[in-house]
Structure formats: C-alpha cells, structure tokens
C-alpha cells in the first residue's frame, strides 16, 4: 500500500465522519466507488464487506457524541429495526455470489440516483413539527424498510444509512432530529450483527502486507476509522449550524455525483 493510497483512505475517513454526523449515512456511498477505484483487484463482495465494516467504525464514533447530547429514541424501535437490517444484510451478501458484478454495481447506481431525486424532493417539504407515539404499524413498517435496505446494503456495500435515513424519515414516529441517531444505531448494531458472514467465508483474494479475515480487510478499516476522529468534533458543530434544506440539497448532490461517477467508472472507462 503506497503513500497515495493511504492519503486517499485518510481523506475518506475524514469525509465519511462528516457524512455520518450530518446526513445520518455512514460513508458507504463514498467508500464503495473509492475502493473500486483504488483497489481494482478486490472482488465486489470484498468491497461491500470492507465498506460496511468501515461504516460501523465511523457510526460508532458519532454515536458517542449523540449519546452525550441525550437525544431520546425508542429502544424497541432501535432493536427491531437493527434486527431487520441484520437479516437483510446477510441475505444481500449471500445473494451477491449468484449475481454478475455489473448487476450489483447497477443496483448501487440506481439506488444512488433514486435517493438523490427523493432527497431533492424532500428538501422542498417543511420540517416535521410533531411526531406520534411509536405504534405497532411503525415497528412493522420500519422493520420491512430496514430489511429491504439491509439487503441492498449487503449486496452493494452502501452501508445502510443512506437507504435507512430517507426511509425512516417517512415514519410519523420519527422526528428529523432523530434520523441520524437511528441510522447510526442501526449501522452499528446491524453492522456488527452482520459481520459473522463476512468473517467466516473464505475470500479468493488476499491483499499482501495487510491484516485480513475472510472478506474484511482490517488494515484499510483501521486507517479510515482512525482518520475519522480528526473531523468528529467539527462534524457535530456543523450539524447544529446547517438547516434542513441545505442538508437535504447537499446530500442530494453528493448522491447524484457518486451515482454518475460510479457509472462512468464501471461502464464507460
């Protein structure tokens, strides 16, 4: 691993933390195209597994800050929705071995473009002023959302937060201020619960001079996660300053750019 590669990973770690804190997405949308660009020999499953593992680390850092801010969320919702994500991620990971790589990348690109459009539309809507109590319908619909989102996350390595945040934002029991907290909780709990499948399955590719178990490369994860500490304090300060409209527009443009970039990288170049 050369200096250029390490520098790129450090930048990704710093930017991933900002994305996780402000938008409630764990950086998987950033890491997937970066890993595909820098490590061209990686199997698509290794890209997904390493990306999702990085998301756990960056989300865990932000969770520590969120807990200190004492923003309340439903414990039952968090556990059930995280369980749905675990199931979905495992199904997506194993399904990826039966799909052509171009199909998986196509799903990733389509997800980015759909989410960007949805985010642009959401930016024009007023912020939710009040929320309802968590009910059975919210728990059920939320679990279906997270299972489906987890499947796409396990298939593509997106991380889940970019999918979960727009989905759970639609639930009447979730306030906008809770979206990032719920997403980060699910990325940590759902991600940790999903790592077993990545660790026990033998990977046909091993990167030299790095520490790797199964499909997860811990050297890459360590560099990205440790560098994310650099922007953690700044991310939380920025989160308090930005308005909902600015946040939604910024996220929409980021998702749109990543979708276009990945398309060019995989299908044009």
Where are these regions (language model features)?
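Juxtamembrane transmembrane-helix boundary motif
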Residues: 1-21, 32-44, 63-155, 170-171, ...
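Transmembrane helix-bundle signature of multi-pass membrane transporters/permeases
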Residues: 17, 48-56, 180-191, 255
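Alpha-helical transmembrane segments and their lipid-water interface positions
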Residues: 28, 55-66, 92, 190-198
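Structured core of small recognition/catalytic domains
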Residues: 180-184, 190-193, 198-204, 213-215
């Amino acid at each position: 691993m050369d200096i250029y590669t390490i520098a790129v990973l450090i930048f990704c770690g710093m930017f991933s933390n900002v994305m996780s804190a402000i938008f409630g997405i764990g950086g998987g949308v950033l890491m997937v195209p970066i890993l595909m660009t820098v490590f061209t020999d990686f199997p698509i499953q290794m890209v997904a597994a390493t990306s999702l593992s990085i998301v756990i680390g960056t989300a865990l850092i932000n969770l520590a800050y969120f807990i200190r801010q004492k923003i309340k969320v439903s414990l039952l919702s968090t556990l059930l929705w995280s369980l749905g994500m675990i199931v979905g991620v495992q199904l997506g990971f194993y399904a990826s071995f039966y799909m052509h790589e171009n199909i998986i990348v196509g799903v990733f690109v389509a997800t980015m473009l759909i989410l960007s459009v949805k985010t642009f539309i959401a930016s024009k809507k007023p912020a939710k002023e009040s929320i309802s109590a968590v009910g059975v319908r919210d728990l059920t619909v939320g679990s279906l959302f997270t299972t489906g989102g987890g499947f796409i996350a396990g298939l593509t390595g997106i991380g889940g937060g970019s999918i979960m945040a727009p989905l759970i934002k639609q639930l009447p029991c979730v306030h906008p201020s809770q979206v990032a907290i719920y997403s980060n909780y699910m990325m940590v709990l759902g991600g940790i619960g999903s790592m077993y499948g990545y660790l026990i399955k033998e990977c046909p590719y091993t990167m030299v001079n790095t520490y790797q178990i199964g499909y997860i490369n811990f050297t890459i994860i360590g560099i990205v996660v440790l560098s994310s500490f650099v922007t953690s304090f700044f991310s939380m300060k920025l989160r308090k300053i930005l308005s909902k409209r600015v946040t939604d527009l910024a996220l929409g443009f980021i998702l749109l750019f990543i979708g276009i970039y990945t398309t060019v990288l995989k299908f044009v170049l």
